[in-house]
Amino acid sequence: MTDKAAQAVRLFTSESVTEGHPDKICDAISDAILDALLEEDPDAHVAVETLVTTGQVHVVGEVRTSGYVEIPQIVRKTLVEIGFTSSDVGFDGHTCGVNVAIGEQSQEIGAGVDASTEVRSGTFEDDDQYGAGDQGLMFGYATNETPEFMPLPISTAHHLSRRLTHVRKEGIVPSLRPDGKTQVTFAYDENDVPTRLETIVISTQHDPEVTQEWLAEQLRTHVVEWVVNDADLSQYYTEDTELLINPSGSFILGGPMGDAGLTGRKIIVDTYGGMARHGGGAFSGKDPSKVDRSAAYAMRWVAKNIVAAGLADRAEVQVAYAIGRAKPVGLYVETFGTAHEGLSDADIQAAVNKVFDLRPAAIIRELDLQRPIYRQTAAYGHFGRTDVELPWEDTSRADDLRRAAGL
């Protein structure tokens, strides 16, 4: 650790992985299947899990739909798009085995979603029809550390991973293979403001003939320095920033041949890089009737609008549901002492209740979630994306929140 690191109040680290990481392959396949089913049937109920290992892809889960899709074809297409096109790179989407074991959604779960507790008790209103697909708690978070209202560490890690994939696919850095990871450590001061980029770690799969010295120079120039300029990180990136590229040495064997992968095993990468709490539910392969996904998106929507409205510098929002019930059983707002203009967290929570309807049917309608938009979220994060447009990143409710808070 450097002297400067020792003087920092805290060091905070976040990681990202590329789309060729085994777990992210699984997320991509599950979301590609989900998108294909939603294209056929917007009301489809989908819960699809994927496992990859050497030469094999296994797809399992539960589905209720009037549509039909060719799952093996979707699996192979997704693998080829990622870059697994030959056994030489550790996996071949053209020839791998694909095993599918998908059953019908439980009728009891389906009944609770289709007719909520409120409907069955005769006390329902508009948007009370659909109950939550499961119990659970979901968090959303936003901060003014970056223009996209995301924590700087996870934003930077994703930026590096996206660039690493770009230079591979475009041939800017030849001899790279799909699997890869990035990690960044930032120093924060006593006011929780990032001050320095302390360490960058990049591990990337590559062809056998590559030397680590050549690879380090290429990635320093075409990935690290490019991202520093593109993301305007020069105030954090200094001559003291430690750069570790493939610190364990060669990385030839990767992808599913190196490690088995599963859907839903990168939930911190998918969200806020550990800067905020997580309810535990994964996203990929789940249709929006599953509040694990839709309510987590809604919480990001709420938190981002709180910060965009200038009500706080940071906001974390929790919501909770009971299976089969439309109305949330809990809502909580935390601003970590950063609320503005004399507001309390309770004031902001009251404003949120006035502006946002957090029943599942309302979330699905307001964010237009019954459409094939999920494959693009399977890698590089579900939040704060600058490369794709996602409805939960909209901040048009900021003015409504200010009015509801009396500002």
Swiss-Prot record:
Mg(2+) binds at residue 23. Pathway: Amino-acid biosynthesis; S-adenosyl-L-methionine biosynthesis; S-adenosyl-L-methionine from L-methionine: step 1/1. It catalyses: L-methionine + ATP + H2O = S-adenosyl-L-methionine + phosphate + diphosphate. This is S-adenosylmethionine synthase. GO terms for molecular function: ATP binding; magnesium ion binding; methionine adenosyltransferase activity. Catalyzes the formation of S-adenosylmethionine (AdoMet) from methionine and ATP. The overall synthetic reaction is composed of two sequential steps, AdoMet formation and the subsequent tripolyphosphate hydrolysis which occurs prior to release of AdoMet from the enzyme. NCBIfam families: metK (TIGR01034). Keywords: ATP-binding, Cytoplasm, Magnesium, Metal-binding, Nucleotide-binding, One-carbon metabolism, Potassium, Transferase. Residues 105-115 are annotated as: Flexible loop. PANTHER family: S-ADENOSYLMETHIONINE SYNTHETASE (PTHR11964). One of its GO terms (biological process) is S-adenosylmethionine biosynthetic process.
